[in-house]
């Protein structure tokens, strides 16, 4: 009886007990399922991280880089120097940034996030994206994930780009609008297609929400994706947004394929 009265008179005590029980349960889970590296499954001290060896194997993309495409340069030749790609084929978006080069470790993370039913991996990837895209967060833009076709999203259970955008929104404090762009045509997967084939594959595949202008309210849009390969998908989405009246679009991704640097996709 005394214990029951204590619960009623001191609800804070109840919450502390519940918190302690949750903590004990967490420790039991850690003992039964100890945290492991997101890439190689080696034991780690905390969950949702890479071990020291795998983390060192990641290739972060840092300055000097192309101010438009975000491609890394070996040496700095000035802040306004553009890459050959940006000069030969100027993109419809303003800037693209990526956290890491697409290599073995990055491929495993993306594959597990995308096809392995591991949405929690988005939290780790988003932490790296938040740093790599820091200059894109100025001016309070809206984060918009590259959409999946509804049928494909049902197959995978979630949109990996949507998970990245939500995790990134929590880290940066930026708004996320997952419904601003829709994929209206189910396309082939881009893996294995040529650059031209990728462009044809996504042509006419996207549409914006009818209230896009109201929802964006003149704010810049930052598209969020897992891997930037040729840019066919992000360029198609960007053109769709600009045609509908968006003022400006930037792009951010976890990994970036750089020809000759690491792995093809």
Regions found by a protein language model. Name each.
Residues 1-265:
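Glycine-rich phosphate/pyrophosphate-handling loop used in enzymes and phosphotransfer proteins
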